[in-house]
Curated annotation (Swiss-Prot):
Keywords: Aminoacyl-tRNA synthetase, ATP-binding, Cytoplasm, Ligase, Nucleotide-binding, Protein biosynthesis. Residues 1-310 are annotated as: Glycine--tRNA ligase alpha subunit. This is Glycine--tRNA ligase. Belongs to the class-II aminoacyl-tRNA synthetase family. GO terms for molecular function: arginine-tRNA ligase activity; ATP binding; glycine-tRNA ligase activity.
Amino acid sequence: MSSQPLTLQAMMAAILNFWSEQGCIIHQGYDLEVGAGTFNPATFLQSLGPEPFRTAYIEPSRRPQDGRYGQHPNRLQKYHQLQVILKPVPENFLSLYLESLKVIGLNLVDHDIRFVHDDWENPTIGAWGLGWEVWLNGMEITQLTYFQAVGSKPLDAISGEITYGVERIAMYLQKKNSVYDVMWNGSLTYGDITQYAEQAWSQYNFETANTTMWLKHFDDFSAEALATLDQGLPLPAYDFVIKASHAFNMLDSRGVISVTERTRYIAKIRQLARAAADKYVAWRESLGFPLLKTPPSTPTVTPKKIPTICQPEDFLLEIGSEELPATFVPTGIQQLESLAKKLLADHGIAYKHLEVLGTPRRLALCIEGLSHVTIRPESEKKGPPLSLLFMTDGSVSPQGEQFFPSHGLSISHRSALDQPSAICRVRSINGTDYLFLVIPEERKETAAILVNELPQLIRSIRFPQKMTWDNGGVEYARPIRWLVALYGDQILPISLGFVSSGNTSWGHRQLDNRQLTIPSSNMYVDTLRSACVIVSQKERRAIIKQGLQNLTGDQIVAIAPEHLVDETVFLTEHPFVISAQFDPAFCSLPKELLIAEMIQHQRYFPTQNMQGEITNRFLIVCDNSPTDSIVEGNEKALAPRLTDGNFLFKQDLLTPLSSFVEKLKSVTYFESLGSLADKTSRLKLHLEEAYALLPLCAKEDIDTAIHYCKADLVSSVVNEFPELQGIMGRYYLQNASLSRAAALAIGEHLQHITLGSNISTTGALLSILDRIDNLLSCFILGLLPTSSHDPYALRRQSLEILTLLYTTQSSVDIEDLFARLIRHFPSSIPNTVWSPEEVLSKLNTFVWGRLRTILSSLGFDKEIIATVLTDNCPKNPLTIIQSAQSIQELKNTQILKTIAATHNRLKKILASLSFSVTEQMFSLQSAEDLLFKQALDRFVEETTALPISSKDYLHLLKELAQSTELFLDSVRVASDDESTRNQRIALLIAAQKCFGFYAWDVL
């Protein structure tokens, strides 16, 4: 970076001049309020159709909701985007962008520049694309996008969009902590020119804007857009689309648009934008697309000779691309490995070892000892019996006349088969002669197979999203820029779109950005290492883990969730771990908020002391050699994030909780079931019904917890960090000096619950009721999970309900609980036909399936689980789990063996008898009958107050089993006397019921 940083206007002029030299038209910002440079017709309209176009311009952008009254260091309601559109996008798109940074004084070697996954979308105008946020030492400075659709229309030619955040770049260049301190020119700051306007417009946007007027504006502008389109004027019509969009943004900032209404407004603007796009393309086509001077090129492939490989060799396929999203690389690794193994297996190609390596810029298939040929030995295929192919006189039968030509055989008589043949032969099986076709040995060169199959293999790699970047007909996660295909030291000629394979790869984009010649496939890893690329993801992970450990110690530990470690592994090709600091004053913010800001927004590793308190040190995984500029830049990048978090948190603390609760009325839970306020009211009814069954905590605490449990959903912090819902509610209740137990419960009720979770009793009850309401809601609305899709996490929530009932030792009939709580839902729901009986039947079946999972996770084997989970078992999860525990402890003892044997004997005897006993009318005559009846009565009396899950119950059941065996050994059940026979059958039926809670026959 130069010693004298550029002023804001000099910097913008330098970038515009750079792009002017690249053939761009230098437009001015549009003369309407737009939310982003994409709205400018030079982008929105010019991206449509096949006509090439290059432009650059500075767009003043209005986002009313982003206003911070001129107090935030870089959050503004009006800011500037320097927009570049390159259509069609050139192959050196990223290189051109990096060159443009040099003209403003950035020495790329000194900085950590990242291309971070960003799938951009503007649903308001039906535009989306794939690309990146560009980070300069942790600060997002640019957005790069390959447009895929605009105006809800797939594009004829792909445009590359570059959106510079000029204020942020200027802050970095001038080393300013606030945008308002940036020098606009040599004498005036950004604040001198804009800060008062930011204050005034924030007040207007949030407090005083006339919503009635803006609502009317939206309707008027929408109507005028349609009317103008009807007149065949797409350019004026699109202006009114822009105006309608700004009216919507104003209404949104005033908070007068509910979630449901917001969706409707966006859909309306998107429809208008689509109509304008259609009219525009039709208009340009009617003019003959005047800017289209030459037709687009198509790929041409010149066949190249496939090399001859004479022995097994190592093989390398490297797919070199622009930076893949970090979460896509593991997917690509897995896909490439499975596809390659299948390809080799399908063709019978032998190899020693196969591995796939991956970095942001490459996926590499490395195969050790790949056989140079695949040989399929001669084989035979059984055909029809000769009796079907020939007549008795040896002539060919009608069936034979069809069979022989269809298999390329010229046979006119049975005698032709008497001569030795290389194509067919006769074999006798069990006295019947059959014709066997001979499939000759087949030898194929592996190189030829790979040349033919690898292009399709690459196309078959499935990513969460794919894109196109030219008219080469290839889709991939990001543009493919090179291919390496080496079999030993020989190049396999592979073509994919406009890209052909070779033996040249590329080094690290910043540390050693040069083209590399790979001498042979077995030198791939070392050659890449020489250019500062650590291609092995395992090695990069080890470096990061060790770096995190080295920079902490006995008193401080890194907060390093595995998903963040994974992401940093695949954000880097040569990782370095460095330490930085932020202002200790921010440590007073909620720990979870600080962690979210650092991990989610910045991919930093926070640290905490041994007491679990957050510290002001954080760790950075960068992809360039550490410098003071990188450390300082990341510290400056985090400061605004923490400032914004502090601003949002303080704003929430100043808002009464009652105001949050009131706002829940305008937040939709499920459209057919009303708002979150309606859900909260339903939870209160659930509590009144369930508290007697689940008296886990003080009533006043759970009352408070339910009243406020959803309040933080409308808070500023949770709007920015949805994953902090519940957690922030705890802080807001504490700030309001409400019940500590209620505050803790709210903080706990959305956390994932496992058998090892530590949760308060109030939190447990709130969690149970909230999850039951979610289950009932989804089952009533028919939103059931499928085998592969569970968008509302109903499986997890049902597991958590059962886990909480077990860990709190809550004994309750869960089917009865569901039946009680379902009464709190309206019997008539819009667009939904439902019956409580049908819903409860499906829900009960679903939940019992999850109880089986709980039992398995507790270590019970399949036989125990099948024994306790029966149609006759109690509908009490705790009882069932305790029963499994008791049976597990007594497994393999004589007690259970006796019970099981007697149960099975009873079952077999009763199944063998024909009877119709409807009442137990006992007038017992024999001593054996009377003695057995006394044993049955004694068992019922002694177990009346005894849980069936207890071992004492099982001991008593064993005693009954012994009495039953004695009875069966002493009498003839099928007595000739009908009365005696019926009485004894009735006794056995009564005994069987005593055994009937469990499926003893599976033990």
